[in-house]
Curated annotation (Swiss-Prot):
Organism listed in the record: Saccharomyces cerevisiae (strain ATCC 204508 / S288c)
Function of the molecule: Involved in the early step of endocytosis.
Biased composition (Basic and acidic residues): 133-147, 180-195
Location in chain, cross-link Glycyl lysine isopeptide (Lys-Gly) (interchain with G-Cter in ubiquitin): K135, K138, K292, K328, K445
Modified residue annotations for Phosphothreonine: T47, T153, T304
Protein's recorded name: Protein PAL1
Gene Ontology biological-process annotations: endocytosis
Further comment: Present with 1480 molecules/cell in log phase SD medium.
Compartments where located: Cell membrane
Lipoprotein found in the keyword field: no
Amino acid composition bias (Polar residues), ranges on this chain: 1-65, 436-452
Region (Disordered): 1-232, 379-499
């Protein structure tokens, strides 16, 4: 009581609680020190009505049936155990009522008793040997059930031996030769009465077993009746929907990636995307150029910003759009190609009035070919510096008396050369007037000239600069690419005169 009061005094009460002044009331604590009252209270609690529970009370969970003489000893034992448990609880100082004993017919009696054994340990009760306990009754029922199940299984095995043959056994080729088996022996009525659904299921399973055995003996008929449907492989949905296959003109939609049946795109060795490698030329092919419109040309409208031709400069070596980083250098035999870029032109010899030629011997000249040509004629640049050349009058063939040792640079005179070339087409003496003398210090660029050497210099050991051929024969004339057109025109005129 002291603990309760101390605990309740520390707990605050609400304003609406009518017992908030109970701790201050002196009438509650007046019997605290009275030993006679405390002893009387203990005796009253021991003889309380809940110590001896009755089965017919309304609070009990059992039905209110009259007392059965068979369950009377069990009830007495349970009540006595409950009484002892109540004494132990009150002796320990707890005022809670003891637990109500459970009936012997409760199927969960063993579980509850095992859970509450550690709480209480009632003294051993002398029980009547004539009546079994609930546990013993359960064991007896279990044994009886097992015996009945054994009897039913034995009866099923006997029934299986008495089953008639299946239809396949009789209709088979071997069955037609042998005689029809005897009918099954009639069984006694008592055995028929005890048959249950389990025997029916076993009978069906045994007959199914006989049918499987007979079907295995005749595999040829099964093969004829059921033929496996062969599903064509590597056929996608587009091929299945192709109507031309019915008329003989079928086609197959084949490609590296099948969008209709994505399961075909899963491959352990190579993915279908690798059909077009990143290093291949197909990865850099650009789109078509913009279509030109006649109205835009007439009215001067030009969309140069949208055209790929003016978008990139000629200095760009590789431009592949967003995939520029993915495009690698030339790997093995795969050559890179970018359709959006223009190739850098390799300029050849310069022709008067026509500009430089980007074609050498009918094929585009590569930078490697020009480098090799420069190396082959590098001996011209060995002496270096200025050299004494013939005068301009001697070069033009005018015959003037001038200093032949006057210095003359290797600078080309385009005006005089073009004038001399014009004279070649009208007179036969133009070839002699346009002769030059090859100096040993002529550069590679000055070698591409349109001049001709006369027949008086045919004994000199000279080399054609462009063709790279030595002319040592006296009747051979060196020609350059710039005068081929004029020589052809001259030959045509000569041919007309001869006719």
């Amino acid at each position: 009581m002291e603990n309760r009061n101390s605990s309740t005094s520390s707990r605050p009460f609400s304003v609406n609680n009518p017992f908030r002044n109970a701790t201050v009331d002196s009438s509650i604590n007046q019997y605290k020190n009275d030993s006679q009252f405390q002893e009387w209270a203990k005796n009253q609690s021991r003889t309380n009505s809940f110590d001896m529970p009755q089965l017919n009370t309304r609070t009990s969970s059992q039905l209110s049936f009259p007392n059965i003489p068979e369950d009377e000893p069990q009830r007495n034992a349970d009540q006595q155990g409950a009484f002892y448990s109540g004494l132990e609880s009150f002796s320990s100082g707890s005022l809670s009522p003891p637990s109500r004993p459970l009936s012997s017919k409760n199927p969960f009696l063993d579980d509850v008793s095992s859970a509450t054994d550690f709480r209480r340990s009632p003294p051993p009760v002398s029980r009547n040997k004539n009546h079994p306990t609930a546990k013993e009754e359960k064991e007896q029922l279990r044994q009886r059930y097992l015996e009945e199940s054994d009897v039913s299984t034995v009866g099923n095995t006997r029934e299986n031996t008495d089953l008639p043959p299946s239809y396949e056994e009789i209709t088979s080729t071997n069955g037609s030769r042998r005689a029809y088996p005897k009918e099954k022996v009639s069984r006694p009525s008592s055995h028929r009465e005890h048959s249950n659904s389990g025997t029916y299921i076993s009978r069906r399973s045994s007959s199914h077993h006989h049918r499987e055995a007979s079907s295995s003996s005749t595999p040829s008929k099964k093969g004829k009746r059921k033929s496996k449907v062969i599903v064509p492989k590597n056929v996608d949905t587009i091929d299945k929907l192709d109507v031309t296959g019915l008329f003989g003109g079928s086609f197959h939609h084949d490609g590296p990636f099948d969008a209709v049946t994505p399961h075909r795109n899963k491959n352990n060795k190579a993915a279908p995307v690798l059909a077009f490698p990143v290093d291949g030329p197909n990865s850099t092919i650009g789109g078509a150029s913009t279509k030109k419109s006649a109205l835009d040309e007439v009215f001067g409208r030009d969309d140069t910003d949208d055209s790929d031709i003016y978008q990139y400069s000629s200095q760009t070596l590789r431009r592949g759009g967003d995939t520029q980083d993915a495009i690698k250098a030339n790997v093995g035999n795969v050559q890179q190609m970018d359709a959006k870029n223009k190739t850098e032109l390799v300029h050849g010899p310069v022709t008067a009035g026509l500009g430089s030629s980007t074609f050498l011997d009918g094929a585009p000249a590569s930078s490697a070919a020009i480098r090799n040509d420069i190396k082959a004629h590098s001996y011209h640049n060995r002496n270096g510096g200025l050299q004494r050349n013939k005068s301009l009058s001697q070069r033009l063939g005018l015959g003037g008396s001038g200093d032949s040792n006057a210095p003359m640079t290797g600078v080309r005179r385009n005006l005089s050369l073009s004038r001399d070339n014009y004279d070649v087409g009208h007179s036969n003496e133009g070839v002699r007037r346009s002769k030059t003398v090859n100096s040993p210090n002529r550069t590679h660029k000055s070698n591409y000239t349109t001049d001709f050497d006369g027949q008086d210099d045919h004994n000199e050991d000279e080399e054609d600069v462009y063709l790279g051929v030595r002319y040592n024969e006296p009747n051979m004339k060196k020609k350059s690419t710039g005068s081929k057109l004029l020589s052809r025109v001259k030959s045509l005129k000569v041919g007309r005169k001869s006719q």
